[in-house]
């Protein structure tokens, strides 16, 4: 790979959501990602929902938003919100106000968590940070971030496992495979897709899910 000079640009992408079981893989629904860039700021959204035919088996909707600034070529997160429903019950519903310069995060404006540094990243914007850092440091093998979620702020390592060719819809894509074992997360980023994920594998408890890219539209 010859990596270009890093630049963040607006894009939208659709992924197919699969559940992997002992009986095989089931296509449950879709997940949409959208990055909006304007005036040295970004808004990164994701939305997921299951198909009507699978609602009886796994009725799930989720919406995430990550908002931040770009200053001196650095991504500075300010705000994160998630709303997730399983059936009629809210399984996740909280917001995080991030104060990097003061090195703390406010959870639902009720609890303040202190961070060890100003490098605070939420569960959605971490993909933007990985895209940026891999391009700027192509020989580095481990990237560490302070990931904040409802459990607090924890340092997590993302290991660059090397190049991997994967097949999506009969198209071979050259990717970089990244593993975050503490998050039980593995994903592949692609140069052709601005170093954003084309495949994401996530394990939650005993459930194993994957997101596989269906389409990607970049705006310049």
Tell what function each PLM region has.
Residues 41, 110-148:
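Short, structured interface segments that constitute the first stable element of a domain
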Residues 103-107, 133-134, 176-180:
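Alpha-helix C-terminal capping segments
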Residues 85-127:
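Hydrophobic, well-structured mid-protein blocks that either form specific transmembrane helices
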Residues 3-97, 138-220:
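Acidic, serine/threonine-rich low-complexity disordered tracts
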């Amino acid at each position: 790979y010859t990596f270009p000079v890093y630049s963040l640009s607006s894009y939208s992408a659709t992924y197919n959501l699969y559940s992997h079981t002992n009986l095989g893989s089931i296509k449950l629904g879709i997940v949409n990602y959208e990055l909006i860039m304007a005036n040295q700021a970004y808004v990164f959204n994701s939305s997921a929902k299951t198909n009507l035919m699978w609602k009886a088996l796994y009725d799930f909707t989720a919406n995430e938003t990550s908002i931040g600034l770009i200053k001196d070529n650095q991504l500075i997160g300010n705000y994160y919100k998630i709303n997730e429903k399983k059936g009629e019950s809210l399984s996740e519903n909280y917001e995080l106000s991030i104060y990097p310069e003061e090195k703390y995060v406010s959870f639902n404006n009720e609890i303040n968590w202190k961070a060890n540094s100003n490098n605070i990243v939420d569960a959605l914007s971490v993909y933007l940070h990985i895209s940026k850092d891999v391009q700027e440091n192509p020989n580095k093998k481990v990237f560490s971030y302070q990931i904040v979620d409802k459990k607090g702020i924890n340092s997590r390592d993302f290991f660059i496992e090397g190049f991997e060719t994967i097949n999506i819809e009969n198209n071979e894509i050259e990717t970089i495979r990244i593993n975050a074992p503490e998050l039980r997360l593995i994903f592949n980023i692609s140069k052709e897709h601005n170093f954003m994920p084309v495949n994401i594998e996530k394990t939650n408890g005993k459930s194993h899910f994957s997101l596989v890219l269906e389409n990607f539209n970049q705006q310049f």
